[in-house]
């Protein structure tokens, strides 16, 4: 199953929207355990759509669906270079991560199995032995907002930072504040 999030691939800021791609073979496969669990035919595709997606999603307006479909069409027809549009987030993440790591922070999720995690909209940082909640609270005193990794289901201490609101004039300020953070929170 390949799930494509509109906010991740197109940086779409509207309603949350995604598409799930399932091969015909998987879609048409019968699983007795699914039939027993969901009380239906047990055919993966039917169960996935009618008993799983339907129950866990709230739906989306038709205009958003048509807009997302048009973005997908334009991308596959070569009219929309969506990768170029989101490269700015990678540039921001690279600069922000350097500021953090230059000041004693470490990247929590730097590898996906054996491959380095690419820079993008979000990245994760930790600091010493601080829990995610502690780090979140302390960063707020320095004007940095984040979310604790614990709220994302992670068992790792740290926070998730977002690049979306970063602007050129904020990098020097961030650098100054993270230097102050390091001085106020010496690592042993």
Whereabouts are the PLM-identified features?
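Short, solvent-exposed loop/turn elements at beta->coil junctions and helix N-caps
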Residues: 6-7, 109-114, 149-151
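Short amphipathic alpha-helical segments
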Residues: 16, 119-123, 157-160
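Conserved glycine-rich beta-strand-loop-beta hairpin in the small C-terminal domain of fold type I
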Residues: 61-65, 69, 82-97, 101, ...
């Amino acid at each position: 199953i390949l799930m494509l999030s509109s906010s991740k691939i197109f940086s779409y800021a509207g309603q949350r929207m995604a598409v799930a791609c399932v091969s015909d073979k998987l879609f048409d496969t019968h699983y007795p355990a699914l039939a027993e669990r969901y009380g239906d035919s047990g055919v993966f595709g039917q169960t996935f759509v009618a008993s799983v997606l339907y129950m866990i999603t709230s739906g989306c307006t038709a205009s958003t669906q048509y807009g997302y479909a048009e973005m997908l069409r334009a991308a596959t027809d070569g009219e929309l270079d969506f990768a170029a549009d989101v490269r700015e987030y990678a540039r921001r993440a690279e600069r922000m991560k350097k500021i953090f790591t230059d000041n004693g922070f470490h990247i929590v999720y730097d590898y996906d199995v054996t491959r380095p995690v690419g820079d993008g909209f979000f990245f994760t940082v930790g600091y010493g032995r601080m829990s995610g909640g502690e780090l979140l609270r302390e960063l707020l005193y320095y004007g940095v907002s984040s979310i604790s990794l614990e709220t994302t289901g992670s068992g790792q201490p740290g926070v998730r930072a977002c690049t979306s609101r970063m602007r050129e004039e904020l990098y020097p300020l961030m650098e100054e504040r993270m230097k102050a953070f390091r001085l106020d929170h010496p690592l042993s």
